């Protein structure tokens, strides 16, 4: 049975030769070189992923939604009742939530995964529950390090199993009342930013309660003293089961040499953790949308990422990842279906990249 250490060790490097071939092919397509902008760079990125066999392509698509409750909800950092996590998880199994509708439109399957819902088991939800909610980070750690490591490994294996069954494009999502608080704590730790700079309204927290949320994040960091150079330490001390789960999806997809679409602010925090745990995951990450949550810009700057969509979204659930899947497919279509300049006897002068 593979250990977490072995999984991290086996994350492949991108295929530089395949990327060079892809760039050469794209430059010869029926258009001025570079005129399709980031669609071209996305195709080259995909070509370098070993799990796609040297060419941009999309098979089955999946959005993995990690569902869990948080002890820090008790600190008054969320307006929604905790039971909403379980209610919405059940709604996901019926296909009626935002991510389900957007994923269906994109032709993707949604996997609803219970990693720590504080309720009875829900039919149709994948059971990876660690506990009924994590610890209150304002008074102590979210979980033990061993719990975090075990969940990372379990989710990574599950992701790789889906890859073996034909999934080639993953999206990450989450569901959990109060989970923007631990996400803000993680972003604060990884980026060295004060809580005031990264704490937002989450699911419509009234402005009058923001200062309390900022204070809770500061207390969580002061009490737990997470090490910013140790991603698992940060996850276990000021994270949550859903955040660990998303990190596991990223690690698993990278291990299989496959792309993973990030969602919003919660996924940025998981990406920061994943990149700290295993820097080799970075080339497999695709940012979907620019979250409207306050700390998004800081997190994305630290990740050196510019999302493809600016939609003022902050729903979470993996909604942005689902919405961006057609962009990935468009990059593949461009690569495979456009004609070539040579076939039409077109010779463009050098330096024509900006031609229209």
From Swiss-Prot:
It comes from Salmonella agona (strain SL483). This is Nicotinate-nucleotide--dimethylbenzimidazole phosphoribosyltransferase. The keyword Ribosomal protein does not apply. The keyword Flavoprotein does not apply. Belongs to the CobT family. InterPro entries: Nict_dMeBzImd_PRibTrfase, Nict_dMeBzImd_PRibTrfase_bact, Nict_dMeBzImd_PRibTrfase_N, Nict_dMeBzImd_PRibTrfase_sf. Keywords: Cobalamin biosynthesis, Glycosyltransferase, Transferase. Transmembrane segments: none annotated. It catalyses: 5,6-dimethylbenzimidazole + nicotinate beta-D-ribonucleotide = alpha-ribazole 5'-phosphate + nicotinate + H(+). The active site is at residue 317. Its EC number is 2.4.2.21. PANTHER family: NICOTINATE-NUCLEOTIDE--DIMETHYLBENZIMIDAZOLE PHOSPHORIBOSYLTRANSFERASE (PTHR43463:SF1). One of its GO terms (molecular function) is nicotinate-nucleotide-dimethylbenzimidazole phosphoribosyltransferase activity.
